[in-house]
UniProtKB/Swiss-Prot annotation:
It comes from Acinetobacter pittii (Acinetobacter genomosp. 3). The record marks 343, 346 as: Interaction with DNA. Residues 312-388 form the Toprim domain. GO terms for biological process: DNA topological change. This is DNA gyrase subunit B. Heterotetramer, composed of two GyrA and two GyrB chains. In the heterotetramer, GyrA contains the active site tyrosine that forms a transient covalent intermediate with DNA, while GyrB binds cofactors and catalyzes ATP hydrolysis.
Length: 388
Protein backbone atom coordinates (compact mmCIF):
# COMPACT_ATOMS: atom_id res chain seq x y z
CA UNK A 1 0.00 0.00 0.00
CA UNK A 2 2.86 2.39 0.78
CA UNK A 3 4.18 1.93 -2.76
CA UNK A 4 0.91 3.19 -4.21
CA UNK A 5 1.18 6.44 -2.25
CA UNK A 6 4.00 7.47 -4.57
CA UNK A 7 3.02 5.55 -7.71
CA UNK A 8 3.63 7.07 -11.12
CA UNK A 9 -0.03 7.10 -12.08
CA UNK A 10 -3.31 5.23 -12.01
CA UNK A 11 -2.47 1.73 -13.20
CA UNK A 12 -6.08 1.10 -14.21
CA UNK A 13 -5.94 3.98 -16.67
CA UNK A 14 -2.78 2.53 -18.21
CA UNK A 15 -4.19 -0.95 -18.75
CA UNK A 16 -7.45 0.54 -20.09
CA UNK A 17 -5.51 2.39 -22.78
CA UNK A 18 -3.49 -0.74 -23.64
CA UNK A 19 -6.74 -2.70 -23.86
CA UNK A 20 -8.30 -0.13 -26.20
CA UNK A 21 -5.30 -0.36 -28.56
CA UNK A 22 -4.96 -4.17 -28.53
CA UNK A 23 -6.58 -6.90 -30.57
CA UNK A 24 -6.29 -9.15 -27.53
CA UNK A 25 -5.55 -8.62 -23.82
CA UNK A 26 -5.17 -11.48 -21.33
CA UNK A 27 -4.93 -11.00 -17.55
CA UNK A 28 -3.86 -13.40 -14.80
CA UNK A 29 -4.10 -12.04 -11.23
CA UNK A 30 -2.76 -13.96 -8.21
CA UNK A 31 -4.39 -12.48 -5.13
CA UNK A 32 -5.71 -13.62 -1.74
CA UNK A 33 -4.92 -17.27 -2.46
CA UNK A 34 -6.81 -17.39 -5.76
CA UNK A 35 -5.89 -17.18 -9.45
CA UNK A 36 -8.21 -14.87 -11.43
CA UNK A 37 -8.44 -14.63 -15.22
CA UNK A 38 -10.04 -12.34 -17.80
CA UNK A 39 -9.64 -11.84 -21.54
CA UNK A 40 -10.58 -9.03 -23.94
CA UNK A 41 -10.78 -8.85 -27.74
CA UNK A 42 -10.58 -5.36 -29.26
CA UNK A 43 -11.54 -3.91 -25.88
CA UNK A 44 -14.55 -6.15 -25.25
CA UNK A 45 -14.55 -8.70 -22.37
CA UNK A 46 -14.97 -12.30 -23.53
CA UNK A 47 -16.22 -13.44 -20.12
CA UNK A 48 -16.52 -12.02 -16.57
CA UNK A 49 -13.52 -12.14 -14.24
CA UNK A 50 -13.30 -15.76 -13.10
CA UNK A 51 -11.37 -17.88 -10.61
CA UNK A 52 -9.37 -20.66 -12.26
CA UNK A 53 -7.33 -22.01 -9.35
CA UNK A 54 -5.54 -21.49 -6.05
CA UNK A 55 -2.07 -20.06 -5.36
CA UNK A 56 0.33 -19.04 -2.59
CA UNK A 57 1.91 -16.29 -4.68
CA UNK A 58 0.79 -12.77 -5.57
CA UNK A 59 1.26 -10.69 -8.70
CA UNK A 60 -0.25 -9.84 -12.06
CA UNK A 61 0.56 -11.04 -15.57
CA UNK A 62 -0.62 -8.85 -18.46
CA UNK A 63 -0.29 -10.10 -22.04
CA UNK A 64 -1.41 -7.99 -24.97
CA UNK A 65 -1.29 -8.05 -28.76
CA UNK A 66 -1.17 -4.58 -30.40
CA UNK A 67 -3.99 -4.07 -32.88
CA UNK A 68 -2.95 -3.95 -36.52
CA UNK A 69 -6.15 -1.97 -37.15
CA UNK A 70 -4.69 0.85 -35.01
CA UNK A 71 -0.93 0.64 -35.63
CA UNK A 72 0.81 0.53 -38.99
CA UNK A 73 3.70 -1.32 -37.31
CA UNK A 74 3.37 -3.78 -34.42
CA UNK A 75 6.99 -4.90 -34.09
CA UNK A 76 8.51 -4.16 -30.68
CA UNK A 77 11.89 -2.40 -30.49
CA UNK A 78 13.75 -4.35 -27.82
CA UNK A 79 16.34 -1.56 -27.36
CA UNK A 80 13.67 0.91 -26.24
CA UNK A 81 12.25 -1.62 -23.78
CA UNK A 82 15.73 -2.51 -22.50
CA UNK A 83 16.62 1.14 -21.90
CA UNK A 84 13.49 1.79 -19.83
CA UNK A 85 13.62 -1.47 -17.85
CA UNK A 86 17.31 -0.92 -17.05
CA UNK A 87 16.41 2.58 -15.86
CA UNK A 88 13.63 1.21 -13.62
CA UNK A 89 16.01 -1.34 -12.12
CA UNK A 90 18.52 1.40 -11.27
CA UNK A 91 15.77 3.52 -9.70
CA UNK A 92 14.48 0.64 -7.55
CA UNK A 93 17.51 -0.96 -5.93
CA UNK A 94 17.15 -4.70 -5.51
CA UNK A 95 14.23 -5.10 -7.93
CA UNK A 96 15.03 -7.81 -10.48
CA UNK A 97 13.65 -7.30 -13.98
CA UNK A 98 13.97 -9.89 -16.75
CA UNK A 99 13.49 -8.98 -20.42
CA UNK A 100 13.21 -11.86 -22.88
CA UNK A 101 13.08 -11.50 -26.64
CA UNK A 102 11.80 -14.90 -27.77
CA UNK A 103 12.14 -13.89 -31.42
CA UNK A 104 15.93 -14.23 -31.21
CA UNK A 105 16.24 -16.19 -27.94
CA UNK A 106 17.76 -13.22 -26.08
CA UNK A 107 17.48 -12.52 -22.34
CA UNK A 108 18.49 -9.44 -20.32
CA UNK A 109 18.48 -9.50 -16.51
CA UNK A 110 18.54 -6.17 -14.66
CA UNK A 111 19.30 -6.34 -10.94
CA UNK A 112 21.22 -3.44 -9.39
CA UNK A 113 21.64 -3.58 -5.62
CA UNK A 114 23.54 -0.27 -5.69
CA UNK A 115 20.61 1.62 -7.21
CA UNK A 116 21.47 5.17 -8.22
CA UNK A 117 25.18 4.64 -7.50
CA UNK A 118 25.26 1.98 -10.18
CA UNK A 119 23.22 4.26 -12.47
CA UNK A 120 25.93 6.95 -12.25
CA UNK A 121 28.65 4.32 -12.67
CA UNK A 122 26.89 3.02 -15.81
CA UNK A 123 26.64 6.52 -17.34
CA UNK A 124 30.26 7.37 -16.50
CA UNK A 125 31.69 4.11 -17.82
CA UNK A 126 34.88 4.77 -19.78
CA UNK A 127 35.29 8.29 -18.35
CA UNK A 128 37.94 9.44 -15.89
CA UNK A 129 36.20 10.41 -12.65
CA UNK A 130 37.38 12.98 -10.12
CA UNK A 131 35.65 11.62 -7.01
CA UNK A 132 34.02 8.48 -5.69
CA UNK A 133 30.26 8.44 -6.17
CA UNK A 134 28.35 10.51 -3.60
CA UNK A 135 24.99 8.86 -2.81
CA UNK A 136 22.36 9.49 -0.16
CA UNK A 137 18.69 8.85 0.60
CA UNK A 138 16.55 10.96 2.92
CA UNK A 139 12.93 11.08 4.04
CA UNK A 140 11.64 14.58 4.75
CA UNK A 141 9.02 15.66 7.26
CA UNK A 142 6.36 16.24 4.61
CA UNK A 143 6.58 12.67 3.33
CA UNK A 144 8.84 13.33 0.34
CA UNK A 145 11.62 10.83 -0.29
CA UNK A 146 14.85 12.22 -1.77
CA UNK A 147 17.64 10.17 -3.32
CA UNK A 148 20.66 11.62 -5.11
CA UNK A 149 23.83 10.13 -6.60
CA UNK A 150 26.52 12.16 -8.34
CA UNK A 151 30.09 12.11 -9.61
CA UNK A 152 32.31 14.50 -11.55
CA UNK A 153 34.35 13.37 -14.53
CA UNK A 154 36.90 15.06 -16.79
CA UNK A 155 34.42 15.81 -19.58
CA UNK A 156 32.92 19.27 -20.12
CA UNK A 157 29.23 18.33 -20.28
CA UNK A 158 26.62 18.34 -17.52
CA UNK A 159 24.46 15.19 -17.40
CA UNK A 160 21.72 15.43 -14.76
CA UNK A 161 18.64 13.21 -14.94
CA UNK A 162 15.52 13.79 -12.86
CA UNK A 163 12.78 11.35 -11.84
CA UNK A 164 9.57 11.63 -9.85
CA UNK A 165 8.00 8.35 -8.73
CA UNK A 166 10.17 6.59 -11.36
CA UNK A 167 8.89 8.87 -14.16
CA UNK A 168 11.61 10.84 -16.04
CA UNK A 169 11.36 14.63 -16.38
CA UNK A 170 13.46 15.74 -19.33
CA UNK A 171 12.63 19.39 -18.55
CA UNK A 172 13.55 19.09 -14.87
CA UNK A 173 11.41 21.04 -12.43
CA UNK A 174 11.37 21.86 -8.73
CA UNK A 175 13.54 18.87 -7.76
CA UNK A 176 16.25 20.02 -10.18
CA UNK A 177 16.00 23.60 -8.91
CA UNK A 178 16.46 22.45 -5.31
CA UNK A 179 19.39 20.25 -6.25
CA UNK A 180 21.19 22.99 -8.18
CA UNK A 181 20.68 25.56 -5.43
CA UNK A 182 22.12 23.25 -2.77
CA UNK A 183 25.00 22.11 -4.98
CA UNK A 184 26.07 25.67 -5.82
CA UNK A 185 25.70 26.82 -2.21
CA UNK A 186 27.71 23.90 -0.85
CA UNK A 187 30.55 24.34 -3.33
CA UNK A 188 30.68 28.13 -2.90
CA UNK A 189 30.82 27.68 0.86
CA UNK A 190 33.71 25.23 0.50
CA UNK A 191 35.61 27.53 -1.88
CA UNK A 192 35.18 30.47 0.50
CA UNK A 193 36.15 28.49 3.60
CA UNK A 194 39.32 27.26 1.87
CA UNK A 195 40.06 30.79 0.56
CA UNK A 196 40.34 29.35 -2.96
CA UNK A 197 38.43 32.13 -4.75
CA UNK A 198 40.77 34.82 -3.43
CA UNK A 199 43.87 32.78 -4.22
CA UNK A 200 42.80 32.03 -7.78
CA UNK A 201 41.15 35.43 -8.37
CA UNK A 202 38.14 34.02 -10.21
CA UNK A 203 34.37 34.24 -9.89
CA UNK A 204 32.51 30.96 -10.31
CA UNK A 205 28.95 30.34 -11.48
CA UNK A 206 26.54 27.44 -11.17
CA UNK A 207 27.45 26.38 -14.72
CA UNK A 208 31.11 26.16 -13.73
CA UNK A 209 30.21 23.95 -10.76
CA UNK A 210 28.23 21.55 -12.95
CA UNK A 211 30.79 21.10 -15.73
CA UNK A 212 31.58 17.38 -16.00
CA UNK A 213 28.88 16.48 -13.46
CA UNK A 214 26.82 13.31 -13.77
CA UNK A 215 23.90 13.18 -11.33
CA UNK A 216 20.65 11.32 -10.77
CA UNK A 217 17.86 12.93 -8.72
CA UNK A 218 14.98 10.67 -7.72
CA UNK A 219 12.11 11.87 -5.56
CA UNK A 220 9.08 10.01 -4.23
CA UNK A 221 6.19 12.45 -3.92
CA UNK A 222 2.59 11.81 -2.83
CA UNK A 223 0.23 13.45 -5.34
CA UNK A 224 2.89 15.10 -7.55
CA UNK A 225 1.94 17.94 -9.90
CA UNK A 226 3.36 18.22 -13.41
CA UNK A 227 3.25 20.95 -16.03
CA UNK A 228 1.49 18.70 -18.54
CA UNK A 229 -0.01 15.25 -19.07
CA UNK A 230 3.35 14.00 -20.39
CA UNK A 231 4.90 14.74 -16.95
CA UNK A 232 8.07 16.21 -18.46
CA UNK A 233 8.42 18.90 -15.76
CA UNK A 234 7.68 18.69 -12.02
CA UNK A 235 5.95 21.79 -10.60
CA UNK A 236 5.14 20.67 -7.02
CA UNK A 237 6.39 23.65 -4.98
CA UNK A 238 7.01 21.62 -1.80
CA UNK A 239 9.67 19.50 -3.54
CA UNK A 240 12.26 22.27 -4.01
CA UNK A 241 12.85 23.00 -0.29
CA UNK A 242 12.75 19.27 0.51
CA UNK A 243 15.49 18.45 -2.00
CA UNK A 244 17.48 21.59 -1.22
CA UNK A 245 17.49 20.94 2.53
CA UNK A 246 18.42 17.25 2.24
CA UNK A 247 21.08 17.87 -0.41
CA UNK A 248 22.60 20.80 1.46
CA UNK A 249 23.03 18.78 4.65
CA UNK A 250 24.44 15.64 3.03
CA UNK A 251 26.65 17.32 0.42
CA UNK A 252 28.25 19.77 2.86
CA UNK A 253 29.14 16.84 5.13
CA UNK A 254 30.56 14.94 2.13
CA UNK A 255 32.91 17.79 1.21
CA UNK A 256 34.17 18.04 4.80
CA UNK A 257 34.68 14.29 5.18
CA UNK A 258 36.35 13.81 1.78
CA UNK A 259 39.01 16.57 1.47
CA UNK A 260 40.81 14.99 -1.49
CA UNK A 261 37.60 14.67 -3.50
CA UNK A 262 36.61 18.23 -2.57
CA UNK A 263 40.01 19.50 -3.73
CA UNK A 264 39.68 17.71 -7.10
CA UNK A 265 36.17 19.08 -7.62
CA UNK A 266 37.32 22.59 -6.71
CA UNK A 267 40.16 22.36 -9.24
CA UNK A 268 37.69 21.35 -11.94
CA UNK A 269 35.44 24.32 -11.10
CA UNK A 270 38.32 26.81 -11.17
CA UNK A 271 39.42 25.47 -14.58
CA UNK A 272 35.86 25.82 -15.86
CA UNK A 273 35.62 29.41 -14.60
CA UNK A 274 38.92 30.34 -16.29
CA UNK A 275 37.84 28.68 -19.53
CA UNK A 276 34.51 30.54 -19.45
CA UNK A 277 36.30 33.85 -18.95
CA UNK A 278 38.76 33.08 -21.77
CA UNK A 279 35.88 32.13 -24.05
CA UNK A 280 34.07 35.38 -23.22
CA UNK A 281 37.15 37.44 -24.12
CA UNK A 282 37.64 35.47 -27.33
CA UNK A 283 33.97 35.95 -28.27
CA UNK A 284 34.27 39.68 -27.75
CA UNK A 285 37.37 39.76 -29.92
CA UNK A 286 35.64 37.73 -32.64
CA UNK A 287 32.55 39.93 -32.45
CA UNK A 288 34.67 43.01 -33.09
CA UNK A 289 35.81 41.54 -36.39
CA UNK A 290 33.06 42.02 -38.93
CA UNK A 291 32.44 38.96 -41.07
CA UNK A 292 32.33 41.30 -44.04
CA UNK A 293 35.64 42.90 -43.17
CA UNK A 294 38.10 41.15 -45.45
CA UNK A 295 40.93 42.91 -43.62
CA UNK A 296 40.16 40.53 -40.77
CA UNK A 297 41.37 37.68 -43.00
CA UNK A 298 44.63 38.90 -44.57
CA UNK A 299 45.84 36.69 -47.40
CA UNK A 300 43.32 34.00 -46.56
CA UNK A 301 39.83 34.43 -47.95
CA UNK A 302 39.43 34.99 -51.67
CA UNK A 303 35.82 36.17 -51.58
CA UNK A 304 33.34 36.02 -54.43
CA UNK A 305 31.60 38.98 -56.08
CA UNK A 306 28.09 37.69 -55.38
CA UNK A 307 26.42 39.23 -52.30
CA UNK A 308 23.40 36.90 -52.17
CA UNK A 309 24.29 34.01 -49.78
CA UNK A 310 21.90 31.66 -51.60
CA UNK A 311 24.02 32.00 -54.75
CA UNK A 312 27.42 32.01 -53.01
CA UNK A 313 29.73 29.03 -52.50
CA UNK A 314 32.68 28.64 -50.10
CA UNK A 315 35.41 26.08 -50.82
CA UNK A 316 37.60 25.02 -47.88
CA UNK A 317 40.96 23.80 -49.18
CA UNK A 318 44.01 22.43 -47.38
CA UNK A 319 47.08 24.64 -47.45
CA UNK A 320 48.12 27.74 -49.37
CA UNK A 321 49.40 25.85 -52.41
CA UNK A 322 46.07 24.12 -52.98
CA UNK A 323 44.42 27.44 -52.24
CA UNK A 324 46.40 29.08 -55.03
CA UNK A 325 45.32 26.47 -57.57
CA UNK A 326 41.72 26.72 -56.43
CA UNK A 327 41.74 30.50 -56.72
CA UNK A 328 42.97 30.29 -60.32
CA UNK A 329 40.33 27.77 -61.35
CA UNK A 330 37.31 29.21 -59.57
CA UNK A 331 34.35 31.21 -60.82
CA UNK A 332 35.05 34.57 -59.15
CA UNK A 333 31.42 35.64 -59.39
CA UNK A 334 30.01 32.99 -57.04
CA UNK A 335 32.90 30.89 -55.64
CA UNK A 336 35.01 31.92 -52.62
CA UNK A 337 38.17 30.07 -51.54
CA UNK A 338 39.42 29.73 -47.95
CA UNK A 339 42.75 27.90 -47.45
CA UNK A 340 43.18 26.24 -44.03
CA UNK A 341 46.35 24.75 -42.59
CA UNK A 342 46.45 20.95 -42.53
CA UNK A 343 44.44 19.09 -39.92
CA UNK A 344 42.71 21.66 -37.72
CA UNK A 345 41.41 21.15 -34.17
CA UNK A 346 38.85 18.42 -33.42
CA UNK A 347 36.27 20.76 -31.89
CA UNK A 348 34.00 17.93 -30.72
CA UNK A 349 36.51 16.99 -28.00
CA UNK A 350 37.91 20.43 -27.26
CA UNK A 351 36.82 22.90 -24.62
CA UNK A 352 35.15 26.05 -25.93
CA UNK A 353 38.02 28.36 -25.00
CA UNK A 354 40.58 26.11 -26.74
CA UNK A 355 38.39 25.85 -29.81
CA UNK A 356 37.91 29.58 -30.14
CA UNK A 357 41.63 30.32 -29.61
CA UNK A 358 42.54 28.18 -32.64
CA UNK A 359 43.57 30.50 -35.48
CA UNK A 360 42.11 28.23 -38.17
CA UNK A 361 38.79 27.84 -36.36
CA UNK A 362 38.65 31.59 -35.76
CA UNK A 363 39.28 32.22 -39.46
CA UNK A 364 36.45 29.85 -40.35
CA UNK A 365 34.04 31.47 -37.87
CA UNK A 366 34.76 34.94 -39.22
CA UNK A 367 34.42 33.85 -42.85
CA UNK A 368 31.08 32.11 -42.29
CA UNK A 369 29.68 35.13 -40.46
CA UNK A 370 26.97 33.43 -38.40
CA UNK A 371 28.63 33.92 -34.99
CA UNK A 372 29.27 31.46 -32.17
CA UNK A 373 27.83 30.57 -28.79
CA UNK A 374 24.23 30.19 -27.67
CA UNK A 375 23.59 33.93 -27.49
CA UNK A 376 25.21 34.97 -30.77
CA UNK A 377 24.85 32.06 -33.19
CA UNK A 378 22.46 33.01 -36.00
CA UNK A 379 22.36 30.76 -39.09
CA UNK A 380 20.42 33.44 -40.99
CA UNK A 381 23.67 35.44 -41.16
CA UNK A 382 25.57 32.66 -42.94
CA UNK A 383 27.38 34.24 -45.90
CA UNK A 384 27.49 31.11 -48.06
CA UNK A 385 24.65 28.64 -48.45
CA UNK A 386 26.91 26.07 -50.09
CA UNK A 387 30.09 25.06 -48.26
CA UNK A 388 32.40 22.44 -49.76
Amino acid sequence: DNSYKVSGGLHGVGVSVVNALSSKLHLIINRAGQVHEQEYHHGDPQYPLRVIGETDSSGTTVRFWPSELTFSQTIFNVEILARRLRELSFLNAGVRIVLRDERINLEHVYDYEGGLSEFVKYINEGKTHLNEIFHFTADTENGIGVEVALQWNESYQENVRCFTNNIPQKDGGTHLAGFRAALTRGLNQYLENENILKKEKVNVTGDDAREGLTAIISVKVPDPKFSSQTKEKLVSSEVKPAVEQAMNKEFSAYLLENPQAAKSIAGKIIDAARARDAARKAREMTRRKSALDIAGLPGKLADCQEKDPALSELYLVEGDSAGGSAKQGRNRKMQAILPLKGKILNVERARFDKMISSQEVGTLITALGCGIGREEYNPDKLRYHKII
